[in-house]
Amino acid sequence: SNDDPVTDLPVLPWEEVRDMQLAGGWKDLDNCRDTVEAAGQLIELVGVADAHADDDAFPEVAAGESAAGGASGAVVKIGVTHAPYQRVLDQMVADGAQLILAGHTHGGQLCLPGYGALVSNCDLPPAQASGLSTWPASFKAIHKGAAPASEEGQAYLHVSAGLGTSPFTPVRTACRPEATLLTLTAR
């Protein structure tokens, strides 16, 4: 059936999927803040809805809290966004995020061996379309060097290439699908 005349693809049942995830304990970070506890440590989360669709609205800081200060007792603040647009990344860094997790780019999807992504499908530099770098980017970080994020004004950025492809370009070239498992350890 033609549920979406723009793409001729069926509309995904995202609301039902979200409701099932929430029932299972998932955190909905669409334009929200929340916390989780892992190994007895509090982790602060801040997220936005899909910036590619202009659905993002950076969540306000609660009265009496400092954006960079974060949740009381949190050991780390993690920003989560589907699409790593620069405006969102800048807001997350200004908010005190130390790590930002993103997707959307499919790793560039069409890459050249030895060069990498040709495009990022957002305003992120193509060299940052997948993997770990820093934001704001340093020259070394976007060329896969070991540039550490500073304590203030910079965050680690991890963009997953993901498993799928764009419905408009359903092929990958020199860009393997990936599911990422990150392990965070104390400094």
Predicted features along the sequence, with ranges:
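Histidine-centered active-site/metal-ligand motif
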Residues: S1-P5, H82, H104-H106
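Active-site-proximal loop/helix segments of hydrolase catalytic cores
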Residues: A51-G70, G79-I100, C111-L112
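Beta-strand-turn-beta hairpins that frame and shape the catalytic cleft
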Residues: W26-K27, R33-L45, G69-I78, W135-A141, ...
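Extended active-site neighborhood of metal-dependent phosphoesterases/phosphodiesterases
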Residues: S1-D56, A68
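N-terminal post-signal-peptidase region of extra-cytosolic proteins
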Residues: D30, D56-V61, L118, C122-L124
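Conserved beta-sheet core of the metallophosphoesterase superfamily
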Residues: P84-T180
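Fold-independent oxyanion-binding glycine-rich loops
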Residues: N31-C32, V48, H82-A83, A161-G162
